[in-house]
Amino acid sequence: MLPSIVTPFIAAMLASWVALLLHELAHSAAAELVGVRIWGMRLGMGPTIWKGSFNGRELHIGAFPFLGAVQLLDEDAGAIGYRDIVSGRWRFEWGPDAWRAPIISAAGGVSNLFGMVLFLVTWELGGEPGMGSFMGQLLLFGIVTNFSGYLNLLPWSKSDGGHLLAHLYAAKLLRPVRAMS
């Protein structure tokens, strides 16, 4: 029998993987919807524990279920405004097809709304987090999805929040504010 802390930890890790997969699939579906091709997807960080192909695209799975990315084809990424992709750094310039980029960036957050609804419904129905019941598993999944979704909206460069901020700035819908001295 596993120690009592191991089972909830494994459950939380599995919930994290599922939440991350749904989040990245939402980005992928949005890219396809607006006509932007992708060549691969990365799920998780750390050393790659599995590499293969899925639906004709490369798929890399990292050891830890945190952070993910949908990799756009370079020419499509350039067409919608991303620059300096080859160097590993990026910046965003607004252009005629740039309206597609915020849609792709926002799609992951929309998938996290599913987790929020799931959490609220399960909580109202009396679920308690854990592996003991189906309701507990749903509640745990909702908690993990909400937590990862909120972190992803923070405006750091590799997050969806950071990408959305860059899109708003490039579209001149957002201006930097200078502190008064």
What are these regions (language model features)?
Residues 1-181:
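Hydrophobic transmembrane alpha-helices and their immediate loop junctions
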